[in-house]
């Protein structure tokens, strides 16, 4: 924020951003830190006061250097560089300038922060559903493939092409569609964010496929 340190700290405490053990820092103090120092200390701070556009860019870069997924919200022209640099740039639909909205990945039509929370929940649900759908499809098709290969090796025609087509239509299509529209799991928003470098096929998923 461009507000003073005292104002920013008071607001942050009131809305739960500045928790015990976390600190606030001003733009002039950021100027005194090298990029390496800022990266090292960035996780100490939850509030950045009296910051200029160049400070916001350095803050975003520092968090990204920590392998964090960074979302940046803003409505003014001075927010545009950091919004463009972040993983997810979020512009304000009502109060935002055209420049900000043009560089943003997402525009909040209602300017409500709670909409971002809803979007994160929806994104986590979609990720879970895609993962479950892929696990189901791979396990089903892998078993099918083993049977077909076994038949070829034994020179026995176990399935005709029409049989394989029927199995795929009957056992894959409907369950896959149902999995795609599953509701959010309980406690989905209490999960910690996944590491940026975490592979999609984790040991758990590979083990699940093998057992299936």
Model-derived features: positions:
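Acidic, divalent-metal-coordinating active-site segment for phosphoryl/phosphodiester hydrolysis
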Residues: 4-14, 54-59, 76-85
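Membrane-embedded transport module
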Residues: 15, 19-71, 86, 91-212
